[in-house]
Amino acid sequence: MIHPETNLEVADNSGARRVQCIKVLGGSKRKTASVGDVIVVSVKEAIPRGKVKKGDVHQAVIVRTSFPVRRADGSAIRFDRNAAVLINKQQEPIGTRIFGPVVRELRGRKFMKIISLAPEVL
């Protein structure tokens, strides 16, 4: 469950290290986001010579949450930290590598490029 002002790790090599959620996309009354949802983020911490700078505003897709994600078979999966991947306006990742596992639910949300770059899909 990602709310506005939630801090997330960045799971790609776009240059950002930490981002903060500004807005949850998908309706004016929508308050929370889960895995596979698109949010608007502000870069709070970035590395030098990266593709993005501190203060930049981008869209991101959530790939890991500490809140459990329930599946149809009754199982649940959760992670230690919240993480997101920065995407451009065409819904493609800005970075060329993905760090850490991502969840299978991204496949249904049409983020196949992120799944193909990820080292592990849970």
Swiss-Prot record:
One Pfam family cited in the UniProt record for this chain: Ribosomal_L14
Record's protein name: Large ribosomal subunit protein uL14
GO cellular component: cytosolic large ribosomal subunit
Alphabetical keyword list: Ribonucleoprotein, Ribosomal protein, RNA-binding, rRNA-binding
Protein function: Binds to 23S rRNA. Forms part of two intersubunit bridges in the 70S ribosome.
GO process annotations (BP): translation
InterPro entries according to UniProt: Ribosomal_uL14, Ribosomal_uL14_bac-type, Ribosomal_uL14_CS, Ribosomal_uL14_sf
PROSITE patterns: RIBOSOMAL_L14 (PS00049)
